[in-house]
Amino acid sequence: MENTLVKSLYRDTDKYAGQTVQVSGWIRNLRDSKAFGFIELNDGSFFKSVQIVFDTELDNFKEIAKLPLSSSVKVEGKVIATPGAKQPFEIKAEKIDIEGLSDSDYPLQKKRHTFEYLRTIAHLRPRTNAFSATFRVRSIAAFAIHQFFQERGFVHVHTPIITGSDTEGAGEMFRVTTQDLNNVPKDEDGQVDESKDFFGKETNLTVSGQLNAEAYALAFRDVYTFGPTFRAENSNTTRHAAEFWMVEPEIAFAELGDVMNLTEDMLKYAMKYVLEHAPEEMEFFNSFVDKTVLERMNNVINSDFGRITYTEAIKVLQESGADFKYPVEWGIDLQTEHERYLSEEIFKRPVFVTDYPKDIKAFYMRLNDDGKTVAATDLLVPGIGELIGGSQREERMDVLVDRIKELGMNEEDYWWYLELRKYGGTKHAGFGLGFERFLMYITGMANIRDVIPFPRTPGSSEF
């Protein structure tokens, strides 16, 4: 008999009612008495489990009644509609085959476990409700983002993981080497001889696919990357991970306003898609993780995003009378408390802050006519503050070279990036969305470690 997914049974119960079906999955819960028992069976296709009713008519009734949690079974039985019960249907088992026994020391027992404990068993945590919901939403959200760009004719570019340049100029990068660390070759000055390494020069894990994406935007017009990025930032916080995923579109013949419009459209599209395609999971998050999740998402979807310059924002904050931990003055990088005040108290909706001081932004951002600010934007949202950062890129070769020199960066590392301005360069712009930060926002999960299947953080590379 062909296997039927539990999702299909829930989505089209009337079609299956009265039919004999085969389902297979893992035992989430089992209750039994002398003559009958109930199994909560989850097959991974759907957030909810299906209730299996079994009784002494089964040849192996006693064996089934003693099965440990997480044992895998294959069940044949009749679908019976139960409109008055908690679940819309159940399956009356006619046959249950044991596929794989679980040991009795299975760590996920019936009690509720803390997220901290579940991180120590990351290989088993997707079997819990919270992480089943989280990682299905992660999958659905990723698909939504791809679909958004594909529907608009964007080309998906696979940018390199190993790179010879530092996009952000931050220097917090993971080095890549095949050198024998017990016998590293040195040059005449006693420095590591990079020419003897695999690539013949210093290489690192990428912090962003943006520079490579710019090259392809100047050929395909509209492109995006969606891939892993790495930061060797020794921050043990709930918001930082050493490995995370970035969504980075790049559009040619575009200015800052165009990229803000794209940001707003993408965010609303992805949120609507998740609400439509993961209703059970989103209801779970709203009930058990963060009771403001649905309200927050609907606020984003139904709002026209605000816009304010950095200079105006500083003035608003200074005149607000609010007691901030970090003093507000022109030139500071806005702190989370400032960002949240603007989005929650002033605008009460998402807001783009634009035209930041050049000294707190990256070298590739277009210098404004005032010589002090750059055409950059951060999208601030109620609940967390900054969600997305974007900018118009500097298309003028001479200005870009000056910025690279001003920041003490090695111009030679960026020769190819500069050449893009030499051969038919044009105005172009893009943004970066930390995918995990987006997931934290829409699920209410408070720690980045809980929205990545196997998180990589300082001192932690288990699994």
UniProtKB/Swiss-Prot annotation:
Keyword set, alphabetical order: Aminoacyl-tRNA synthetase, ATP-binding, Cytoplasm, Ligase, Nucleotide-binding, Protein biosynthesis
A GO molecular function held by the record: ATP binding
Cellular-component GO terms for this entry: cytoplasm
Segment forming the signal sequence: none
Record Pfam families: tRNA-synt_2, tRNA_anti-codon
PROSITE patterns registered for this protein in UniProt: AA_TRNA_LIGASE_II
Enzyme Commission number(s): 6.1.1.22
Cited CDD domains: AsxRS_core (cd00776), EcAsnRS_like_N (cd04318)
Compartmental location: Cytoplasm
InterPro entries named among the record's database cross-references: Aa-tRNA-synt_II, aa-tRNA-synth_II, aa-tRNA-synth_II/BPL/LPL, Asn-tRNA-ligase, Asp/Asn-tRNA-synth_IIb, NA-bd_OB-fold, NA-bd_OB_tRNA
Example of a GO biological process term: asparaginyl-tRNA aminoacylation
Reactions it catalyzes: tRNA(Asn) + L-asparagine + ATP = L-asparaginyl-tRNA(Asn) + AMP + diphosphate + H(+)
Matching NCBIfam families: asnS, PRK03932.1
Family: Belongs to the class-II aminoacyl-tRNA synthetase family.
Self-association and partners: Homodimer.
Protein name: Asparagine--tRNA ligase
Naturally occurring in which organism (per UniProt): Bacillus thuringiensis subsp. konkukian (strain 97-27)
Phylogenetic classification of the source organism: Bacteria, Bacillati, Bacillota, Bacilli, Bacillales
